[in-house]
Amino acid sequence: MLDEYTTILNGAEAELIEKKSRFIATVRPVKDENEAKAFIAEMRKKYWDATHNVFAYQIGERNEIQRSSDDGEPQGTAGKPVLDVLMGGDIKNTAVVVTRYFGGTLLGTGGLVRAYGRSAKLGIEEAGIAKVRHYNCLLYT
C-alpha cells in the first residue's frame, strides 16, 4: 500500500470555448472501473446531443487501470491528452469526461489535443487536488 497518493477533492465541471466549439470537462472521484463506467454513461446521457463525449480514467494505487476513448475524434487527439493530464499529475482514482459541442470550425489535430488537454486540466483544477496519506493507528490497553 502506498503511504501517499494524489487524487481530486470533489467532483467538478469546467468549460472552455475554442473557436466556437464548447468543451465541458466533468471530473469525478471513482473507486473502481464499474464506478467510472457508470459515470461515463451518466455523462453520455446528460449530454446526449453532444458531438463527442471523450473520457479517460486512472484507477488503483499504481495506476493499474488506465483507459481512454477518443469517441470518434481522430485517433490520439482527445482521450489520450485527457489521460496524459491524469498521468502527468499522477492523479489516481479519477475519471474525466470532456464533452464537445462542435462550433463549425475544424481545430486540426494539434488544436484538438490542446483543447481537450486544457479542458481536462481546468476541470481538475476546479475539483481541487488532495494528497491522501495512510496512517497506522495503534491502540495499547
Predicted regions, residues:
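Short flexible coil/turn linkers enriched for glycine and charged/polar residues
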Residues: 21, 50, 90-92, 133
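Glycine- and Gly-Pro-enriched alpha-helical subdomains that act as flexible
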Residues: 95-98, 105-137
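Conserved small/polar residues in nucleotide/adenosyl-binding loops
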Residues: 140-141
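Short beta-strand/turn micro-motifs at beta-sheet edges
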Residues: 11-15, 83-86, 127-128
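Ordered, amphipathic secondary-structure segments that act as subunit-interaction surfaces
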Residues: 66, 73-105
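Solvent-exposed alpha-helical segments within well-ordered globular domains of core cellular machineries
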Residues: 34-41, 45, 84, 114, ...
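C-terminal regulatory domains involved in ligand/effector binding and gene-expression control
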Residues: 1-76
